[in-house]
């Protein structure tokens, strides 16, 4: 049986490679893959025709920083201790499905913030095998962290040590010491992780720490990175403090998440070493582009930290904007939008002066490189998966354009689309 042919007529066309929108291009899809692309491409008689001449066609988008294991950001903390692991796995399925409907054909899960298990690997594999529908998942089920750290949600029970101690045991990658973390890396690789995630500093979401607080010592981080590299996998770190970012670079980390308190010296080190950063602008946008009403919607400690670090966040955003750091597009929504509404990050990048092409490239080509799947997706090229999205709103002038996907195809199959609930 011959593979299905699909002929796509593009209005505007962005391939993820060149910083331009081309007009009048066509894409021929054969089965799962892009077969041919060009302005003068003829349509085979047997091909199904999809007319997107009134839309901008792009690669399927990629969100490089998601936490998929909750249903609603308003109740994320309650879900951590009130939902079963089975229910948390269902939330991952739902997030993957909704992300795909929004034009994001691949997502990266940066560790469970409610879940303690490995349900995300089951969902990842089931999607890959075609058993269920959803965005392709690249995942670390758990992050490596220390007691009392940003990754230790038993901070909520710090006033009840007996309960905190019992709950802490459920987090098998939460501990201390070089040998503990060497073993943790080996176990996560054994269980099927796609990469290693560590919590190097405190954060904004957790109640009892600071984003400048060092939460893994140099011996621990060096051991984690070395062990991961020996096993052929990569490491990324949740981190804010410039001194910690510099230390991680010296220890040859592959990339980092957030980096919102960036300074010039640290940015230069990123540039010189080719270390990537997924800056997750949106969670701090209410402080950078000050909006007291939106800040008031966040959890109390998040509000307080945004107010306290507002000036540093503004300065850090500008350092990132003017740098030549390799930047990925990721959302990290736990306190302002639903985790599958990845298009909100586009608004944050555009409002920060990043420009449409820099943002689109981060969400396509660069993200595919960060995730290690650039040979399969991220750009529109013959031989790659037919991961294709289309948008009817103007990507150059409409900051909310990525919240309203008009068409999505993943591996040659067309799926229904769904706009954000917030537009």
Where do the PLM segments sit?
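Metal-associated gating/positioning segment near the N- to mid-region
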Residues: 55-129, 147, 219, 248-251
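His/Asp/Glu-enriched, well-ordered alpha-helical/loop segment
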Residues: 80, 230, 300-301, 310-395, ...
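Divalent metal-dependent hydrolysis catalytic cores, especially in the metallo-beta-lactamase
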Residues: 93-119, 133-143, 193-206, 234, ...
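Active-site gating loops and adjacent loop-to-helix segments of metal-dependent hydrolytic enzymes
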Residues: 68-88, 147-169, 203-217, 273-310, ...
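Alpha-helix-loop-beta-strand connector modules within alpha/beta enzyme cores
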Residues: 125-142, 212-237, 278-282
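N-terminal metal-binding scaffold of metallo-dependent hydrolase/deaminase domains
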Residues: 1-44, 57, 393-399, 413-414
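Histidine/acidic-residue-rich catalytic or RNA/ligand-binding cores of hydrolases
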Residues: 75, 120, 150-152, 207, ...
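C-terminal cap of metal-dependent C-N hydrolases
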Residues: 11, 15, 31, 363-365, ...
């Amino acid at each position: 049986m011959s593979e299905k042919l699909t002929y796509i007529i593009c209005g505007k066309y962005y391939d993820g490679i060149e910083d331009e929108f081309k007009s009048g291009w066509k894409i021929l899809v054969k089965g799962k893959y892009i077969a041919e692309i060009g302005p003068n491409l003829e349509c085979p008689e047997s091909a199904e025709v999809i007319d997107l001449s009134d839309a901008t066609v792009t690669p399927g988008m990629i969100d490089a920083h998601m936490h998929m294991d909750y249903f609603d950001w308003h109740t994320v903390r309650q879900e951590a201790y009130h939902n079963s692991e089975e229910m948390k796995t269902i939330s991952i399925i739902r997030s993957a499905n909704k992300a795909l409907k929004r034009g994001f054909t691949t997502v990266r899960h940066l560790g469970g913030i409610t879940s303690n298990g490995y349900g995300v690997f089951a969902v990842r594999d089931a999607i890959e095998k075609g058993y269920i529908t959803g965005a392709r998942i690249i995942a670390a089920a758990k992050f490596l962290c220390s007691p009392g750290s940003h990754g230790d949600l038993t901070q909520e029970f710090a006033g009840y040590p007996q309960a905190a101690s019992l709950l802490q045991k459920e987090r098998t990658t939460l501990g201390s010491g070089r040998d503990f973390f060497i073993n943790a890396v080996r176990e996560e690789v054994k269980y099927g992780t796609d990469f290693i995630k560590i919590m190097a500093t405190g954060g904004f979401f957790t109640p009892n720490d600071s984003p400048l607080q060092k939460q893994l010592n140099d011996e621990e981080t060096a051991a984690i990175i070395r062990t991961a590299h020996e096993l052929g996998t990569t490491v990324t770190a949740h981190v804010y403090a410039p001194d910690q970012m510099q230390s991680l670079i010296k220890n040859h980390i592959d990339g980092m998440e957030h980096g919102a308190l960036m300074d010039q010296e640290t940015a230069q080190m990123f540039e010189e070493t080719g270390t990537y950063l997924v800056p997750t602008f949106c969670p701090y946008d209410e402080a950078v582009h000050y909006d007291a009403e939106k800040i008031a919607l966040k959890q109390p400690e998040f509000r307080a930290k945004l107010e306290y670090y507002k000036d540093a966040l503004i300065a850090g955003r500008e350092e990132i904007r003017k740098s030549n750091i390799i930047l990925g597009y990721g959302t990290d929504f736990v306190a302002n939008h639903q985790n599958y509404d990845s298009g909100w990050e586009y608004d944050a990048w555009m409002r920060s002066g990043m420009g449409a092409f820099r943002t689109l490239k981060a969400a396509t080509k660069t993200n595919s490189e960060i995730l290690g799947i650039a040979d399969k997706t991220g750009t529109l090229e013959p031989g790659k998966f037919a991961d294709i999205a289309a948008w009817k709103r103007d990507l150059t002038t409409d900051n909310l354009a990525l919240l309203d996907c008009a068409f999505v195809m993943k591996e040659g199959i067309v799926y229904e689309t769904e706009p954000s609930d917030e537009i």
